[in-house]
Amino acid sequence: MTNPIEVPDVSIRIVEIQREEEVLSCHFGSVSWLVGTGIHLQASRLCWRIPVRRMRWRYYEFPKDGLYMAPDVEDIPVQNDRTGFQGALSSHAFGIAASLLAFFGFAGVGGGCMERHASLLCVLAAKHAETDLIRQAIAGYID
């Protein structure tokens, strides 16, 4: 599947690697162990009603070495405790939001790889059909 979500001018592909460690180490090297845990923690912050760690997660790559993770489910209820926002995001929008929170949270770690991934993911989020919902979900967590 070349473009599993509708994002204008962005080509995204599903990573077919079966093991989390393999795909994360390709993108994040020695700090890869932080990324999966960080994204799952941020996902739990956004959706504390559902055990997101137990969901099946997929890895998505886009040009220029970007990567994000998203659960393989339908819409996910989210709540932002800092702003009071409540809503639902598609799995891709949810994964983008959780990944952004993790990458920004780890800024300064990994020799710039977190910042690079956050920057690329911001471009994707800005072109996503659920841009406003993603922004509302992460508002107050990222300065």
Predicted regions located by residue number:
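Negatively charged, low-complexity tracts enriched in Asp/Glu with abundant Ser/Thr
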Residues: 4-51
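Intrinsically disordered, low-complexity segments enriched in small/polar residues
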Residues: 8-9, 27, 64, 135-138
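Short amphipathic alpha-helical segments, especially helix-boundary/capping motifs
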Residues: 18-21, 73-77
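Short runs of predominantly hydrophobic/aromatic residues within well-ordered alpha helices
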Residues: 20, 56, 93-96
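Amphipathic, interaction-prone secondary-structure segments
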Residues: 32-76
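Polybasic, proline/glycine-rich intrinsically disordered low-complexity segments
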Residues: 76-143
